[in-house]
Amino acid sequence: MAVGGGLTVTSLMRQSARYNAHRLAVRFKHQQLTYAQAWQRGVKLANWLLALNLKPGDRVGVLEDNSLEAQDCFLGCAIAGLVRVPLYARNAAASHVHMLSHTDCRLVIVAAHYADEIEQIFDQLPVLETVLIRDETYEQQLMACSDKDPEVILDPEDWFVIRHTGGTTGNPKGVAYSHRSWLAAGRDWFYHFPPMEAGDVCLHVGPISHGSGYLYTPTWLAGGMNVLVDHFEAEATLELLSSAQVGYLFLVPAMLSMLARHPKARELSFERLKVMQIGGAPIADDTALLAREVFGDVLYQGYGQTEAVPVCMMGPKEWFSEVEGSKPLRSAGRTLPFARLEIRDPDAPEIEMALGESGEIAILCDGQMTGFWNNPAATEERMTSDGFVLTGDIGRLDANGYLYVLDRKDDMIISGGYNIWPAELENTLLNHPAVIEAAVYAIPDVKWGETPAASCVLAEGAVVSETELIALCARELGSYKKPTSVFFQKTPLPKSPVGKIQRKTLREPHWAGQSRRVAGN
């Protein structure tokens, strides 16, 4: 078989399927498939989709959890040359409509238990022609499709997937990855990792349409096995890490905290574990140190955004070392060899700030967007004339090149003329052993205009007072930065569909009835 088109996700996955035909490619619960079996299912779905009058380059919306059928979709769209548009299960209907309409999706593939969400908005989507519901008839229909590879010829610059930003302010923005940029992102994720070998196992506790998906393709290309779970549960994850001899996985800090603090973590063996990749949110020092004690030197931290990823990375050797003039434990790592990172003047983004000065983080890497999908105004706002992506994050670089992320540009609190970054306070609060979640935001104040307030979730059975936490922040950061109020809640903090804490949701009730609020807050 000879299929032209250069280095694409599809051509490389096809090659790996051929060379690893009898190895295990995927496992979900008690089901598992070899590479040959998984590829054949992908080919069948590709032919099914092409028979629905779709053509390469068309966009296909997808609403699903991790499952064997999710892998069918990943492979089937790649083989057919279709562009996946993953939807988020926690999205409101209006977000589904926006994501499907502005990408002109002609078809949606949806798991049966989410079908109502798509059927309810079908009439609002004039371009949408077909909804493929994966119900009890799916398997029979799939098996009836041809298993002859359509051998669609693709170019490395053809679009592969459109992921959407978290949408914490305004509508989510579409970020399109070409085959080339998706492969580059996967390569750069694995640059610092111990080499993955055929037969190694990568566990996906989050959807492969989210952050964990960056590890899916490299695992397949290396001849490894992707193990999928449809939801995260700490004890079950620990048992799977041990029994499946997992080598690699992606976690957000809250998940790592739950794993490290679970009694089972000290009872089980994780001898094959090589990498616990942490990302998506700041991690508390105590959590990182405890996880290292429990799991060993397997923690890796990365920094990037949907728009450009990864840019920074740090392995355990650096993360937990002492470096004169730097605090690696508090940093997001150092710039990868194949990327550039600069601190730009927030008011004049063409100007680079001096080392040690804070400003907007600007990034440039192979795995970045060329612009937002169908949104030239947002593209112009977020991309510089020399090709850098403006992240909206405020940070600084020290003399050794370590990046410290201070906060989101739009979340800055201005209290009595002083600039206060919520993330700095959140990190301090999270370093208290009783606090497992923290969010800081502005509330109105008659004297100062606005002041920081914090909402915290405590570990089970933990006790700490508002006074203690306020004193901790004053001691660590200075009195003018301390929160004036700390609110405790028993339920998890509100999060966006991609897992980011929504400060806006916590902040808004405090501003109800106010005639104005400070810009950006």
What are these regions (language model features)?
Residues T34-Q37, F160-R187:
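Conserved AMP-binding A3 loop
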Residues L221, V246-L251, A260-K327, R340, ...:
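Gly/Ser/Thr-rich phosphate-binding loop
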Residues G4-G6, A21-H22, S146-H164, N171, ...:
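Conserved pre-ATP/AMP-binding loop-to-beta segment of ANL
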Residues A2-T10, R14, L24-S67, Q71-L75, ...:
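Conserved AMP-binding/adenylate-forming core of the ANL superfamily
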Residues F338-A362, E381-R382, A399-N400, A462-E466, ...:
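Conserved beta-loop-beta connector loops within the AMP-binding
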Residues A70, N91, V108-V110, L241, ...:
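AMP-binding/adenylate-forming catalytic core of the ANL superfamily
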Residues L183-V201, S209-Y248, H262:
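Conserved AMP-binding/adenylation subdomain of ANL enzymes
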Residues R14, A51-L52, I79-Q141, I153, ...:
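Structural core segment of the AMP-binding/adenylate-forming
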